[in-house]
């Protein structure tokens, strides 16, 4: 038995093959915890974005309803103005001009 070899009598405990099972469990646990945190963070971000989108959608819906009501009111005003315009035009240019009484005498 030769003790002057360059290899140590016991293998290096830092190599992956010689690490303890508790190290692997701890490392796996840290990885799982990290992934769980990432998943929760992503889920919170997605929920926040979803709420923001719903709020934006609601605001746009309310604004759209307001525009529709305003449009209907303007249509009614335009129709009334059109009728008034027709009435005034009829007064200005009657279909049958009255016969002048001076011509009949």
Swiss-Prot record:
Protein name: Protein LITTLE ZIPPER 2
Originating species: Arabidopsis thaliana (Mouse-ear cress)
Highest taxon of the lineage: Eukaryota
Function comment: Competitive inhibitor of the HD-ZIPIII transcription factors in shoot apical meristem (SAM) development. Acts by forming non-functional heterodimers. Part of a negative feedback loop. Essential for proper functioning of stem cells in the SAM.
Complex and partners: Interacts with REV.
KW Lipid biosynthesis (keyword) present: no
Region (Disordered): 1-20
Induction: Up-regulated in response to increased HD-ZIPIII activity. Up-regulated by REV.
The entry's keywords: Coiled coil, Transcription, Transcription regulation
Lineage summary: Eukaryota, Viridiplantae, Streptophyta, Embryophyta, Tracheophyta
Coiled coil: 39-60
């Amino acid at each position: 038995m030769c003790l002057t070899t360059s290899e140590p009598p016991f293998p290096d405990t830092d190599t992956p093959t010689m690490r303890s099972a508790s190290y692997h469990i701890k490392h796996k646990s840290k990885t799982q915890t990290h992934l769980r945190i990432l998943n929760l963070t992503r889920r919170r971000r997605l929920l926040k974005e979803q709420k923001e989108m719903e709020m934006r959608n609601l605001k746009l819906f309310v604004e759209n309803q307001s525009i529709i009501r305003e449009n209907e009111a303007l249509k009614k005003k335009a129709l009334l103005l059109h009728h008034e315009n027709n009435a005034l035009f009829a007064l200005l240019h009657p279909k049958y001009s009255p016969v002048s009484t001076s011509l009949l005498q």
